[in-house]
Amino acid sequence: MIYCFHYKKHYLNDIDSIICYPYKVSIGYNCFINRNVYITARSEITIGSNVLIGPGVIINSGMHHYKNPNILIRDQGHHIKPITIGNDVWLGANTMIMPGVIIGDGCVIGAGAIVTKSLPPYSVAVGVPAKIIKKRK
């Protein structure tokens, strides 16, 4: 069991899970973070209460710029935006959440999906990139 900086209890299955810049991460109550999860908070990441995060999930609030072919990608800086994950969300195994995404309450993200755009509450989304296939409500 770990405690985030807001002192809210949640469970982190700490087998090979990493949270980079943990002071920028806020995690609600009763969350489960499975093994091999990688969270990089170059900007703020907010995870609501009762969230299930499957194994191998990547939540990354920053990515490299790459548009100028005359400059090495590593020297072009980063695109950094906050991520918000609502309450009662399930992120299936090996999903990836990209910078700037807001995932509404009650969403289900299918295994292997890459979420590049925000999702309204109670959406079920799958695929690469993730697309809404139905609503829970």
Where is each model-derived feature located?
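Extended, small-residue-rich solenoid/repeat segments and analogous flexible loops
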Residues: 1-24
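Flexible, glycine/small-residue-enriched loop-and-beta-strand segment within the central core
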Residues: 18-27, 32-101, 128, 136-137
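Short alpha-helix at the nucleotide-sugar/activated-sugar donor binding site of glycosyltransferases
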Residues: 52, 107-108
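Conserved acidic donor-binding loop of glycosyltransferase catalytic domains
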Residues: 60-61, 110, 116-117, 133-135
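Short beta-to-alpha loop/turn elements within the nucleotide-binding domains of ABC transporters
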Residues: 101, 112-113, 119, 128
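Conserved catalytic segment of ABC-fold P-loop ATPases
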Residues: 104-107, 120-122
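C-terminal end-helix/capping segment
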Residues: 119, 123-137
